[in-house]
Amino acid sequence: MEYKSNQHRQMAKVKNILSQIFFPKRLESYSHESYSGSCGAHAQWSLNPENGELRITGTGPLYDFFGEKEVPWESHLNHIRKVVAHGITYIGFQTFSYCKSLSSVQLPDTLTGIGQHAFAYCKSLPSVLLPEGVKHIKDYAFAHCYHLQELTLPTTLKSIGKAAFCSCHGLN
């Protein structure tokens, strides 16, 4: 009985706090979606919803996104048209996979590796220029990029993982 009484008091406090939030009269909509945040220990992202440009800045590797760790721009996957990255060293597991509208990627010269499935199913991506310094491309990194027609590999490349470019029908 004591538990329910405490629970009711807590709910009353929450209702009181929420009743003190005032929104401007001209506010037409409110979204809980995020357009910026963290994507690595020292890396941040921001998305311009107007033009679909996703900017990644910072240093070091991006997170690997699997299991409990979801891609922070998950709700915007279909709207991302361009990725511009600065300062990062590694693109993690599934970082940009399923960005079906992605048509342009600018990767930094600090990049040394591309993780598994990093760009998998980016069906609109026509070309990729991997900068000098990239040493490793992991399994399925660009798998199912059906429109990928142009790929420039760096001289620093040491390994290409299994099926890294499978179902990239535009590559000869």
Stretch-by-stretch model annotation:
Residues 1, 11, 25-27, 116, ...:
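A subset of signal/propeptide-processing and intrinsically disordered low-complexity segments
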Residues 1-94, 109:
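N-terminal capping/linker segments that flank leucine-rich repeat
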Residues 8, 21-22, 52-60, 77-90, ...:
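Structural signature of tandem-repeat unit edges
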Residues 33-35, 42-44, 71-73, 107, ...:
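Short, flexible coil/linker segments at or flanking structured domains
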Residues 43, 64-66, 121, 139, ...:
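Residues at secondary-structure transition points
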